């Protein structure tokens, strides 16, 4: 996950989650503030459709070093792998994803409200998952790749 600060007429943050295997982005949560408890709630919501991850790779932001997040992960046996400060390449998938999000969506829109930001960012996320093929997964969309993997694993 990552936490992107987005100055505009409104100040908001975007919490992003990317599956390193499928390249899918199951959620981008947009709000004025996103703390450790909110991150835990978001990951619990994802559990219903995706299960829990074995590992979470994240930076050392306060939402990831919070007691709520660390306790949640420990109770579920989830490994937390913190990247070293100043070494974003240790979390290359999310850094690449966040760069695309910033360049293709955040820097090309002037958001007038939190609702507007959420709508535009969600449309971008759907396009990223369902329309855009990725060379790293055989020129399939992340949604196609994940669906194929699930059917082969069944």
Predicted stretch roles:
Residues 1-154:
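Charged DNA-binding/catalytic regions of mobile-element recombinases
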């Amino acid at each position: 996950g990552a936490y992107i600060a987005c100055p505009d007429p409104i100040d908001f943050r975007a919490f992003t989650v990317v599956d390193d295997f499928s390249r899918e982005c199951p959620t981008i949560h947009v709000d004025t503030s996103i703390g450790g408890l909110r991150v835990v709630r978001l990951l619990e919501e994802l559990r219903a459709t995706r299960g829990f991850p074995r590992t979470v790779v994240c930076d050392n932001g306060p939402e990831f070093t919070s007691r709520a997040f660390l306790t949640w992960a420990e109770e579920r046996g989830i490994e937390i792998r913190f990247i070293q400060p100043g070494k974003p390449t240790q979390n290359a998938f999310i850094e690449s994803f966040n760069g695309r999000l910033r360049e293709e969506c955040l820097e090309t829109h002037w958001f007038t409200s939190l609702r507007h930001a959420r709508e535009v960012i969600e449309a971008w996320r759907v396009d990223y998952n369902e329309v855009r093929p990725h060379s790293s997964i055989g020129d399939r969309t992340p949604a196609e790749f994940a669906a194929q993997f699930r059917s082969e694993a069944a």
